[in-house]
Amino acid sequence: MSKRVCVIGAGPSGIAAAKNCMQAGLNFVVLEKNDKVGGNWVFNSKTGHSSVYENTHLISSKSWSEYEDYPMPDDFPDYPNHYQLQQYFEGYAKHFNIYSKIKFDHTVTKVIRQSNGSWLVYYLDDQGQKQNEIFEYLMVSNGHHSVPKYPQYPGQYTGRFLHSQEFKGVEESWRDKRVLIIGAGNSACDIAVEAARVSKVVHMSMRSP
């Protein structure tokens, strides 16, 4: 019996890993907790999970962001939006026949390394049932920005406190409000631009200049 490979996640890295597994003739399966390929690039207005914002675009040009063996369409702008990126990832998965190897709505809950070097993977299947399987190889492609980290500050704050993971787009309730954004990374800068469209004033607090 051939050795098995488990790929966790069907985002940009996961489908690339799957394509290479397929071309190498490996026996593999992809476990994806959502119902689409694309990972964080699949927009969903619901909170409680990581995804792009309503107006997210690439911050690097398409020529620097595309797969070397599957270029982005010529009619895409230099900086595609998230809808176009999702279409691109879906096209990639179809082109390389990856869909047949993906188990959607399968959430990995725990992975344990065995004494013989194999991996025991626990997951919930698409019916919510607990399952587990042994794989000889494991490829973790689920990213590392799915669990929000909240800073701890002394004192009390009575206004609305929102983590960037929960942000999907500016709401009407932001209009004419004062907004403080903690941090100056990609998420912070994206949200600052969106907030500035409707808020009274937007401040950014950063650890270093």
Enumerate the predicted regions with their spans.
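Glycine-rich active-site loop/strand segments that organize a redox cofactor
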Residues: 33-36, 40-91, 205-209
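The conserved SAM/SAH-binding core of class I Rossmann-like methyltransferase domains
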Residues: 8, 31-32, 182, 205
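Glycine-rich dinucleotide-binding loop and its adjacent helix/turn
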Residues: 75-77, 81-85, 101, 140-198, ...
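N-terminal Rossmann-like FAD-binding beta1-loop-alpha1 element of flavoenzymes
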Residues: 3-30, 189-195
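Short, conserved catalytic or adaptor-binding loops enriched in Gly and charged residues
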Residues: 56-59, 97, 152-157
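Short, solvent-exposed loop/turn segments at secondary-structure junctions
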Residues: 13, 35-37, 47-48, 70-72, ...
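Conserved acidic residues
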Residues: 4, 136, 177
